[in-house]
């Protein structure tokens, strides 16, 4: 299980990303519309003003139950080994084990 501080840090990043999302999106649209290079540099400077952790690339998906950062399935929000355990225990509706 991941440390609680890492999980809380990720939640803080998600809140920051939601807070600055509209500002980033509008600035990016502005950059594409402005023809002069000097204006683009000014807008680019505005894009760098919010905190680093507000960037969507800083987000990392984590397992819903354990907080594990690797091997996550987007459809379920679980890591691979937890997903396998839950499917074997019939806790996920619609998920079946393959057999051939």
UniProtKB/Swiss-Prot annotation:
Q: What is its main location?
A: plastid
Instruction: Give the GO biological process terms.
Output: translation
Query: Record's SUPFAM superfamilies?
Result: Glucocorticoid receptor-like (DNA-binding domain)
Name the Gene3D superfamilies for this protein.
Answer: 1.10.287.1480
Cellular component annotations (GO), alphabetically ordered: chloroplast; ribonucleoprotein complex; ribosome
Which chain positions lie within coiled-coil regions?
none
Q: Does the keyword Chloroplast apply?
A: yes
The reply on keyword Chloroplast is yes
Any one GO molecular-function label of the UniProt entry: rRNA binding
Q: Specify the superkingdom.
A: Eukaryota
Q: Where found, per UniProt?
A: Plastid, Chloroplast
Q: What does this protein do?
A: Binds 16S rRNA, required for the assembly of 30S particles.
The identity of this protein, by name, is Small ribosomal subunit protein uS14c
Q: Which organism is it from?
A: Manihot esculenta
Origin organism lineage: Eukaryota, Viridiplantae, Streptophyta, Embryophyta, Tracheophyta
* Name of the coding gene: rps14
């Amino acid at each position: 299980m991941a440390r609680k501080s890492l999980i809380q840090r990720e939640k803080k990043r998600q809140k920051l990303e939601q807070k600055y999302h509209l500002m980033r999106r509008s600035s990016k649209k502005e950059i594409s519309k402005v023809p002069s290079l000097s204006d683009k540099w000014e807008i680019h400077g505005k894009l760098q003003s919010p905190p680093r952790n507000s960037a969507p690339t800083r987000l990392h998906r984590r397992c819903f139950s354990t907080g594990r950062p690797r091997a996550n399935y987007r459809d379920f929000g679980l890591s691979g080994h937890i997903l396998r355990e839950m499917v074997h225990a019939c806790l996920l509706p619609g998920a079946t084990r393959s057999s051939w």
